[in-house]
Every structure is written in C-alpha cells, then in structure tokens.
C-alpha cells in the first residue's frame, strides 16, 4: 500500500463528541484553557497558584497520559479581526469610524501582530472499547475542569469539530478550515479535512508541509534549578511556535524503589572510592565532589517523595517551528535556543525523526519521542502555563482600552457586562486621564447607541463634543444657557413616585443653600408640604410652560405661616432674584442630543457644587427617560469635589447605587486621589465600582490604593512614574496592565488632546 499524507497522522477516528481513538486501546480528549494572572500576582497568590498546579499534576495516576500544548499562531486571530469591525451607521461620523478601525488594526500590528495564543490539555486513557473509554474520559474531564476552575482558570471541553480545527490550523497555517460532520461521507476519514497537500520528511533536520518548512526539536533539561518564567519567555516570542509537554506519572512505590536503587548504587561507588584511597595511601574520607553532590541530590529526592507529597513524572518536551523560508525558521529557532541556553537547557534538533516530532507536537495525546526526563511534581510545575490574564470581550458593545502591557494583546471590554458598570478614572496631571476618558466617550459614540453626558468643570471637552455634533451647555451667571433644577418627567427616579424622588434632590440642593449643618426637621416638613402644590399645574397639564421654577418655590415658602418658611425664602433669595439667579429659569437647551456636555468652568465657586448637583439631577431625568431603551453614560470630572460636602456626596452615592438599575453608567474622573479617599462615602463608591482605570499615581495615593484594591508590588510598577497612557485596568476581578499610544495623526487625537501645542 502506498504511504499517503493521511497516514502520517496516526489516529483511527475523531468523533463528533471530541473523543479521538488513537489505536485499538487508546482514546483522548482535549480541553482549552485561558490564562490567569501569575506574573504580576501577589507573592502569596503566586505560591498558591504554583502549589495548586503541582497538586493538579499529582492528581493524575500512571494510567493516564497528559499533554499540555501551547500554540502561538500568526495571523490566526479571527476573533480579534471581527472585534475591530466597527459597522458604519451613516450618521455623519463614518469617516471617524474608518479612522478608528484603521487605528485598531495598526495597534494589533504594533502589539503582537494578531498572534493567537492557545493553551490545551489533552488526556489519554487506555480502554477495551469506546464505551469504557467514554466513561473514563468524562470522569477525568469533570475533574480537570473543576481543578482548573479552583485555580480561577476559565476552561472548556472541545468537541470533534473544534479539535479538528486546531489540527487543521497547525498543519495548514494559511488556509481556512471548512468542515462539518454532516458532510462527512460514510467511510471517509476526518483526516481528509485537516492534512496539508504534501508532507516531505526526506531532509534529516527539516520537513516540508504544504508551502511551509517545519522543524521539530526536543528540549533537554540540563539545569539543576529552573525558573517559572522560562515557558512564558518562549511564548513571548511573536512567532509561530508549537510546544508540547508529554507527562506521565510513575507509580509512587515504583518511584521510591527506583530512587532507593540509585542511592544503593551511590553507596557502592563510595565504598569503591574508599578502597581505592586506602590502596593509594591517601585519606579515605576525601570523595570526588560530583559523587558527594549526586548523593545529596538523591537523598533529598527520596525525602521529597516519602514526606513532601512529591510525585515522579516522566516528561518529554517537543518544540515545532515553521516558516516559509529556512532562513526565517532558523532565526526563530536560534531565538528559542538562546533562551534555553540562558536557563542552562538545550534545544536539540530531532535528526531523522522529524515526522515523529511533528506527531508528538499535535494535541492528540501521542508521544513518539522516546527521549524523556524524570521530574518531580514541583520541577514539572515550574513549566507554569500562566503569565497574564487577557481582557478581550467579543461583544458588539466592546470598547478599546489599549494593549496588554505584558502580552501586547488588544484590550477590548464591555462595561455593561459587569455586575456594577460604575467606574473611576484616576491619575496625576499629565498621566493621560482626560484623554482616556475622552477615548472611551468617542468609542462609545462610534460603537454603541448610548447617550453620553459630561460634567466638565474645566471646559476641556468642548472640542470633542462639537466634533460629534453634541451640545455644549455653558452654565454660568453670564451665560444664556439655562437649566431648571425643578425639571421633572413622569419617569423620574423609580417612575412610580416621581415627586418623592424629586423631593430628595430639592432637599439636597436646599441644604447646600442653607449651609451649616443642613436643614432641620421642621424646615424639611415645610418644604415637603410646598412641593406638591408647585407641581400641581404641571401634573395636570405637563407642558414646558407649566414647569415650576425656583421663584415658585420661593413664593410658596414665603407664604407659609411658619417662621421657618420665611427664613428659608430669605436664604433662597440670592438664588432667585439676587446675583446667583442663574438657576431661576426654565430650561432652554436641547437635552435630547446623543452627546451633552455641561461646561461649568465659569460658574463661580459659590455655585459650583449646586451646579454639579443640578447637572446630576438632569442626568437622572435623562436616565429615567432612556430606561429600558439604551444606556446613559455619565462622566463627572473633578469628582472629588462632589464627595467633599455631605449633601452632594450622599446624592452621588445614591447615583452610584441606583443608576445601573436604569441603564446608567457613571464614571468619576479625578487627579485628587487624596481628597477622594478622604471622603466618608468613598467605601460606598468603591463597593459599587467594578471598573477602575488607574494611570500614574503620586506615592502617597499609590500606597492607599494598593491596600484598597489589593494591588501587588509588580502591578504597582505600572502606576509608578509611568508614561502617559500607561497604567492598570481593573475590570471586575481581572487586573490588566495596559498601554495606549494613540496615533497623533488622526482627527480624533486632535479633538481629544489637552496639550495646547497639539490642538489644531
């Protein structure tokens, strides 16, 4: 029989369920698993992950073979490509969408060139028939998934189609996989759909497959101690790399017997050396240093096996690289070799056994390489498969947050997927804080249907807002843009009692007016009595002309019998007919725009807090209008100002607690982290915040934040004297170091930068 391309791939059948029958007696199944934070974790967390991984290896008995496969593929990131396809909306901003898509493409190239990194564990059992194999594999699968889950690792079992796609993509790097079990003809092998056009294993050090040249090597461990960074360093190479670890446990009593035999051999050698010394007439206690070291190693290994819960494994490590030219291939291999040498190990080409090397690297669970090495659980666990968690949510509402500083993968996330989408953006002046906020706003406008509202105390968002035809509302005593603090709509607050919720806001505002220790119980009662009366006309006939203004409340309070009514009216006077009467008008601005910016830069210091409170209330109006139909994103710059006063602080906490129910996504932005952290309400804010974008921090603030958010020392480096646009992103339970170098030659950059010399 002629030997065909398919004969190289040595399995009998790969079933739809994901079970692969390798030969008469062996069956395997595969699980794909994701990365977790290891490199930047707290020391105790790192130790925990390491021990959990070693225990995970210990859980396999000698009847099971395990293969860990790490596959890095260039240009295979379909998921990433689809995530950056921002669809046009024909709303006048499609030129910016095009620019944003191009920017994302260039970020991928700048990052790791769309390198797809995958991790798999394949487990193989021996069984007499498929039925027996299925029950064994299913039990194992449940155990492996739960072990990985307990380490915080997301993992999922692969079905037949998914396993075939992985094999196809390794063997056909430039082709698209097209296969469905429905189309499989009777007696046709699934191999037909995964093999390349040709295999040529004639050369001794290379092999050809399709249009590519590959090389398989085995990894020789010569070092006495290994680093848990080594595997990560190999996988950091931005090139096509396949690495497989074949691991099989040795029966514990066998392992102990084996080590004891070694110990006996060494003792015999020592006796021989002693006799030699006596015959030659020198001191019999002087032994060759190699023999002493070796003897100590064997004794400590025996102790580990007997008392330290260590197990012995037989491990084979195979590498496979490929490229279109021998020169490119040799470059990558020499890169790998130099990392191996640095760690006192060696990458050795599998001369004349390239075919066996290729088979051993495929995630099938087959090891054709007879070169192995005995390692304990801890030595095997040193090949730690985890480095950094990725944050990549493939959703139509995902926004761009830069590149992962460790893996250089795109960070795409959708805050709406969080339990609490509320957020904070924190950073010192010049850290890129405003820029990050603007980038998120612009991205949200381009990608989602959400409304965006900004409270702008420094007047720095106007450029961006005008770019997107938004409305900039200048709130100041000189401006002719008016906001009525008494505005209400029928959905206001919880919707069932709009006035009750509105009363809360009016009380908060009047507490600011009165100052001191706030309103007395008597004053609150009088206000509460007046409010339904001033809204009567509007509720009977809800037209804009019937909306009450502060003047109506002032008149009503003045007309009350109690002295406190008149006292309150007097205290309100300056805001009604005096020099601070900017809020005593009906609203005359278009609040229905998709993008709204309240510019309060010229609102005097006396009115700033009231201004921020009134804006917050207008946002409530908007959120309650949008409820159920779309999200409302609200950005509050200089957020620490709102948390300084009890009244504005408690109102802000209310927003933080209740907004999400109605589709509101508030974001506080501040450079004054110290002031923010001093607020009594900060615990409530942090407890209800699942998104924190942290840029460079001042040293004192850094320490407080590290305690509050459990940041490890290696993570802290990313917010210590860091460059503009670099920092840490907290997204639910995920912490990712990021960097964002936004291209300066774009329309958006010009509209987002706050550097005077760059604004055109």
Residues of each region from the PLM?
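A short helix-turn-beta junction within AAA+ P-loop NTPase domains corresponding to the substrate/partner-engaging
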Residues: 469-473, 681-694
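Conserved lysine of the Walker
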Residues: 433
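Extended, folded cores of ATP/NTP-driven motor/assembly subunits in large transport
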Residues: 1-388
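Hydrophobic anchor at the beta1->P-loop junction of P-loop NTPases
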Residues: 425
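Hydrophobic positions on the alpha1 helix immediately C-terminal to the Walker A/P-loop
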Residues: 436
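Post-Walker A helix-loop "phosphate-sensing" segment adjacent to the P-loop in P-loop NTPases
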Residues: 443-453
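P-loop NTPase motor domains
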Residues: 36, 43-62, 73, 233-236, ...
């Amino acid at each position: 029989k002629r030997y065909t391309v398919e004969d190289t791939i040595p399995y009998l059948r790969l079933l739809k369920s994901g079970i692969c029958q390798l030969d008469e007696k062996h069956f395997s199944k595969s699980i794909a698993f994701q990365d977790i934070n290891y490199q930047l974790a707290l020391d105790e967390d790192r130790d925990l992950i390491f021990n959990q991984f070693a225990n995970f290896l210990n859980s396999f008995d000698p009847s099971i073979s395990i293969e860990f496969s790490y596959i890095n593929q260039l240009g295979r990131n379909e998921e990433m490509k689809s995530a950056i396809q921002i669809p046009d909306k024909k709303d006048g901003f499609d030129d910016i969408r095009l620019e944003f898509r191009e920017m994302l493409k260039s970020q991928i190239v700048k990052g790791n060139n769309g390198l797809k990194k995958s991790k798999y564990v394949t487990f193989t059992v021996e069984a007499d028939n498929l039925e027996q194999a299925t029950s064994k594999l299913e039990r194992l699968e449940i155990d492996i998934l739960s072990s990985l889950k307990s380490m915080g690792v997301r993992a999922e079992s692969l079905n037949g189609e998914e396993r075939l796609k992985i094999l196809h993509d390794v063997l056909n790097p430039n082709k698209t996989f097209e296969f469905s079990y429905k189309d499989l003809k009777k007696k046709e092998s699934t191999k037909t759909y995964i093999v390349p056009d040709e295999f040529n294993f004639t050369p001794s050090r290379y092999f050809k497959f399709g249009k590519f040249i590959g090389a398989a090597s085995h990894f020789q461990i010569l070092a006495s101690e290994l680093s848990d960074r080594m595997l990560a360093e190999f996988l950091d190479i931005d090139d096509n790399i396949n690495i497989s670890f074949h691991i099989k446990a040795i029966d514990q009593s066998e392992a102990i017997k084996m080590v004891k035999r070694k110990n006996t051999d060494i003792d015999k050698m020592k006796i021989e050396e002693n006799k030699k010394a006596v015959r030659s007439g020198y001191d019999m206690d002087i032994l060759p240093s190699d023999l002493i070291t070796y003897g100590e190693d064997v004794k400590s290994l025996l102790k580990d096996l007997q008392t330290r819960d260590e197990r012995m494994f037989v491990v084979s490590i195979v590498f496979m690289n490929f490229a279109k030219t021998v020169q490119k291939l040799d470059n990558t291999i020499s890169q790998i070799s130099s990392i191996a040498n640095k760690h006192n190990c060696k990458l050795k080409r599998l001369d004349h056994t390239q075919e066996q090397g290729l088979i051993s690297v495929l995630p099938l669970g087959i090891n054709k390489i007879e070169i192995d090495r005995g390692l304990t659980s801890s030595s095997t666990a040193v090949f730690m498969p985890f480095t950094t968690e990725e944050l990549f949510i493939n959703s139509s509402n995902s926004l761009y947050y830069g590149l992962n500083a460790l893996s250089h993968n795109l960070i795409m996330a959708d805050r709406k997927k969080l339990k609490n989408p509320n957020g904070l953006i924190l950073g010192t002046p010049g850290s890129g804080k405003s820029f990050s906020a603007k980038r998120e706003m612009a991205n949200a406008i381009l990608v989602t249907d959400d409304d965006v509202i900004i409270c702008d105390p420094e007047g720095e968002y106007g450029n961006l807002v005008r770019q997107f035809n938004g409305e900039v509302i200048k709130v100041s005593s000189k401006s002719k843009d008016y906001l009525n603090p008494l505005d209400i709509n029928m959905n206001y607050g919880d919707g069932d009692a709009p006035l009750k919720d509105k009363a809360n806001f009016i009380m908060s505002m009047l507490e600011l007016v009165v100052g001191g220790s706030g309103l007395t119980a008597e004053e609150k009662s009088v206000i509460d009595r007046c409010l339904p009366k001033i809204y009567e006309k509007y509720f009977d006939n809800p037209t804009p002309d019937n909306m009450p203004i502060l003047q109506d409340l002032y008149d009503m309070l003045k007309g009350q019998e109690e002295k406190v009514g008149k006292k309150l009216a007097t205290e309100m006077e300056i805001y009604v007919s005096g020099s601070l009467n900017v809020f005593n008008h009906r609203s005359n601005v278009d609040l229905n725009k998709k993008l709204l910016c309240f510019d309060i830069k010229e609102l005097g210091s006396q009115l700033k807090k009231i201004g921020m409170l009134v804006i917050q209330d207008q946002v409530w109006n908007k959120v309650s209008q949008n409820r159920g139909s779309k999200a409302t994103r609200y950005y509050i710059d200089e957020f620490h100002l709102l948390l300084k006063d009890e009244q504005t602080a408690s109102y802000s906490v209310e927003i933080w607690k209740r907004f999400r129910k109605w589709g509101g996504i508030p974001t506080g932005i501040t450079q004054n982290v110290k002031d923010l952290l001093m607020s009594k309400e900060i615990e409530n804010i942090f407890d209800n915040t699942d998104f924190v974008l942290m840029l460079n921090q001042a040293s004192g603030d850094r320490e407080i934040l590290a305690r509050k958010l459990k940041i490890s020392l290696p993570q802290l480096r990313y917010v210590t004297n860091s460059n503009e646009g670099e920092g840490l992103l907290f997204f639910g339970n995920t912490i990712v170091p990021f960097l964002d170098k936004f291209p300066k030659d774009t329309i958006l950059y010009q509209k987002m930068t706050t550097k005077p010399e760059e604004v055109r």
